[in-house]
Amino acid sequence: VNIRSVVLDVGETLIDETRLFGRWADRLGVPHLTFFGALGAMAAAGRPLIDAFRLVRPGFDLEAEIAAWREEEPGSLRENFDSEDLYPDVRPALTALREAGLQVLIAGNQPVQAGPALEAMGLPVDAIHISDVWGVAKPDPAFFARVAQEAGNAPEEILYVGDRVDNDVLPAKEAGMCAALLRRGPWGYLHSELPEAARADVIVDSLAELPGWVAARR
């Protein structure tokens, strides 16, 4: 397989979400360990992230809380991220992929404002795509069809990189793409132990492993 495009997820692939969820814990009034434990429990149980919020605050309304938070702290990062949250292997790995002649895209499940936040980082990528802008999110096959459309290459020439089996590896493979499972973040570690992780073309511990892996297959 001659890989021409590498497409990367955002949360826990490019962005370390520790600070983001720490701010949420503070907002919810619970210790960081408590909230992080709740998030991990939901990840292990295959339950949606929002269930962790509702566990520590029954009846939690995400949209209402974000709106109130924005009004109270208009100048803070709140539920968003910035360049300080970028994993240290991101820039070197993306640079190496670009220098190898590969198209590098970002496409992940994120709110609209994640687009400008990523653009502001000046990452060495060809384009940045956000689910809330597209109006379709992973694991919907339509998301991966859109990825292939934006890449302009055949699905088998695209490597999708993410930290989840359910949202990244399996739907990418169903779309005919290659898939890399990144073993970091709560989901990355948990999902690397699932039997379905074997569907990934490669499991990596760092983005730094990608340029060499792709080069060996071109």
Go through the PLM ranges and name each one.
Residues 1-102, 111-115, 124:
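N-terminal helical cap/lid subdomain that shapes the substrate entry/recognition surface
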Residues 1-6, 91-218:
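Asp-based, Mg2+/Mn2+-dependent phosphohydrolase catalytic module
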